[in-house]
Amino acid sequence: AAPLGVKSLVVDSAADACAGQVAPLVVADWTDYAALEKFAAQVDVVTFDFENVPAETAHWLAERVAVFPAPQALAVAQDRLAEKTLFRECGLSTPDFMTVDTREQLDQALARVGAPAILKTRRLGYDGKGQFRLRAVADADAAWAALGAQAPAHGLILEAFVPFERELSVLAVRGRDGDFRTWPLTRNWHVDGVLSM
């Protein structure tokens, strides 16, 4: 933002947040509404750079200042089930998937989705975290042992495994005036399911 002449102010709960190296940093918890009130009074627009900002906080901020993307988009991005459901509603292809809340539902999901498959937490998983790869149906006990305890808090989803050659990312933005822009595709390199570059 700085090279574009845009002044930034950053909120993070960590005093050593990396964004604090390039912009003034407000150290506050996402539910510290007194600090967030002061933050909102100093900015024209709020955005976020990862999806684990509580959606409730984004909604709260949106009542005080413009928030982009919209808090509703953040809420969808935080839940793999909501994402996949939205994609299908938009006519996009997704791997087969099924929610899993109990060990018995994992067996049912495997019967429907098949193996290989990936059991994932619906929330807060990234870079291979919150995931277990089932190479065969016989891996169900190990998968449940690894992630089952997270089912009550985060929910789980079983997704059919998709063999792929590479993962690509694109940065796309839409301005308030409707102008839509993209930047060139970049390739993501993974090692053991974790983004390394």
Question: Model-derived features: where do they sit?
Answer:
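ATP-binding N-terminal substructure of ATP-dependent carboxylate-amine bond-forming enzymes
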Residues: A1-T85, E89, E104
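Active-site nucleotide/adenylate-binding loops and adjacent lid/helix of ATP-dependent enzymes
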Residues: V76-S169, V173-M197
